[in-house]
């Protein structure tokens, strides 16, 4: 989740005593560009030219003290307006489209003939000033409006009572990328990654565009469980799962559907009372027991790893260690039945292991260094887990790369970030700009696959060969709020062992625009994140005989 919050910056209304400068003919001749973001129309005007609605650069429009009896719906085309004054006109109604002008901070409707207001005004979640005095509005509306913080209360009331359109979402498309191998033995399984938006983060301060009833956990949890159950993934990685909800909702509901699970809360839970601990969020992994058997489970506390590897770095202690994000990992044994039929089975002594890792990195955009180091710490710990798992009796080989890895995460990092570069390219320069020129160099080598005393040639490397399941901009965004729309959730997999057969595509972006959905959650979308879902094809590292010959791994 990207906790940037609703815009509450100080708003300065236009100055009525402003002085304009008219360009001279010489300035015009010399090509000087004019800039005007405000427009005032006065003189007892009765109607407005349609060309006005093409001035989309306007931020302030003064239409007060005229004789306007109606405002056309096309006013909503002025999407950059933050100030609109319609006071002292002859308006008896307002267009519902006014509610689409979500940039508005000030809307003045004083001294008109308004008896009702369109409930769509409730969508103006950034509005700080609403002028309604001098209108014959109902007592219900005026009593709310005249309360302390009346503007906010009235807007919330209208948003909560606004009818929801459209009635349902269009289906997300399944994008097939490759057909399953029909010659070599392979196992196919699906993986979901989903940030479910923890209840304590789902506030009107952050998501003012969403009705309060649709932010309520009792409402949202139905949509979240519907999303999870509908796609029926073999492996499910969830972030922002509240501790109490894991034990009372997610685990019981998914156990009934043939899953087992593992969960760990953020590190802060350790120092909290039992009651407070219930509301700490964390990461969970679920897997279908008919397809996988749990071998090991692990929690990685980033603040503990940071403390153990600080090597005297103040930045490590003051910036990284203070964040209590965590990751979880499970080592699973893949059931032999998954490897298809009609082919020579894997040797009975071979056990195909799979590691699934899930993490949620720090949210703040100003802490790109922390996100990158948290990712390095997590991958380094996963490498340790793999090394231990690969040396277990019955495991195929001592090489950690022989055990395939699926890494799911809300990385809170865009595709062009150091975090994604590190995961995708096998490493990152130790002077990468995301480190912000802070002194991390010594301790970073603890997380490089070459080791503290190895030759790194100025790079921090991890040794895995990972690839994102969602490449080539298959998703335009995974997090969709008013403030921010971008890809920050990922599913990575070991490309030496696996192929992507397909992924769940995006919700139609045009549909979101056409229905004026400026951010999620929404009555039809229960989280501010969209789920990721991929179907992976796994080939065992040691392939069986085909016609008496060992076929090499094609990857």
Swiss-Prot record:
EC annotation from Swiss-Prot or TrEMBL: 3.1.13.4
SMART domains per UniProt: LRR_TYP
Cofactor(s) needed: Mg(2+)
Repeat (LRR) residue spans along the chain: 57-78, 80-101, 103-125, 126-148
Cofactor binding comment, as recorded: Binds 2 magnesium ions, but the ions interact each with only 1 or 2 residues.
Subunit note: Component of the CCR4-NOT complex; distinct complexes seem to exist that differ in the participation of probably mutually exclusive catalytic subunits; the complex contains two deadenylase subunits, CNOT6 or CNOT6L, and CNOT7 or CNOT8. Interacts with CNOT1, CNOT3, CNOT7, CNOT8 and CNOT9. Interacts with TOB1. Interacts with NANOS2. Interacts with ZFP36. Interacts with ZFP36L2. Interacts with RBM46.
Role noted for this protein: Poly(A) nuclease with 3'-5' RNase activity. Catalytic component of the CCR4-NOT complex which is one of the major cellular mRNA deadenylases and is linked to various cellular processes including bulk mRNA degradation, miRNA-mediated repression, translational repression during translational initiation and general transcription regulation. Additional complex functions may be a consequence of its influence on mRNA expression. Involved in mRNA decay mediated by the major-protein-coding determinant of instability (mCRD) of the FOS gene in the cytoplasm.
Protein name listed in UniProt: CCR4-NOT transcription complex subunit 6-like
Protein's gene: Cnot6l
